[in-house]
Amino acid sequence: MKPAPFDYHIPDSIDQALVLLREHTDTAKILAGGQSLVPAMNFRVVQPSMLIDLNRIKDLDYVREQDRCLHIGAMTRERTLEFDARIAKNAPLLHEATPNIAHPQIRNRGTIGQGIVTLW
């Protein structure tokens, strides 16, 4: 099946994404990796009137150490967790668990934020 028609927006900043989300709170869905959302749309289980694609927002894709804490952005790919030395050093359980998330192709697209939101 194909998804129902929808508008597609690719904001370049968090502020642009928030404006779109505020204007279309009840009808928009956020697209990160798409592993859960796209199949649900194809089966028309989910029929948003708008997709807000966060993939151009580089401010959400990071791994950094700051003030003795490890910070991971919501758009950081699961594959990054598997190979980033800072993750291995500071979050070894996360690093060891990541290869068990689906197949490498899925980890290449899946984001840490999407994984958390999907479980929520």
Region roles according to the model:
Residues M1-W120:
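C-terminal structural segment of proteins
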